[in-house]
Amino acid sequence: DAGKLIQVRTHTRFVHFPKHTHNYIEVIYMCSGSTRHVIDGNDVALMQGELLFLNQTAVQEIYPAGEDDIAVNFIILPEFFDYSLKMIGEENNLLRDFVVDCLRGENDSSGYMHFKVADVLPVQNLLENLIWSIWNRQPNKRSINQATMGLLFLQLMNHMDRMEMGTGGKQR
């Protein structure tokens, strides 16, 4: 899988993951059930249909997930977001700032963004499309995945009132 800008993996259940960081951006989508995380000292409960973005500097601890707790982890290299960033334009907002900070390797924003969007059908559909597209090899896969992520960002920008972020980084 070396060289891939985005990968998808199922979340490992029944195991405690002590505090750690990643050299990539992690996006966790909770398909069913829930998982409990401590991110940069903040307790985060990720519920079914919710989305959690973690930057490269986020310190994450994960408590064991149960049998019915199913999550998908997107492992994303920062350059994957180049196209998506063009789609969301130049307007300043917390999501754009988060992505730009990830691209620059800076930690000016919080280490995570938690979107409580379980009842937002377009977001759920785009996440399902992204998982399907990554899992199933097809022509134009990279462009499709990057455009889908851009559409996901645009939808999330319409629901910033459902986003929570950690206390780290600068506040706007």
Predicted feature locations:
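Generic protein-terminus/edge-of-domain signal
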Residues: D1-T35, V44, G111
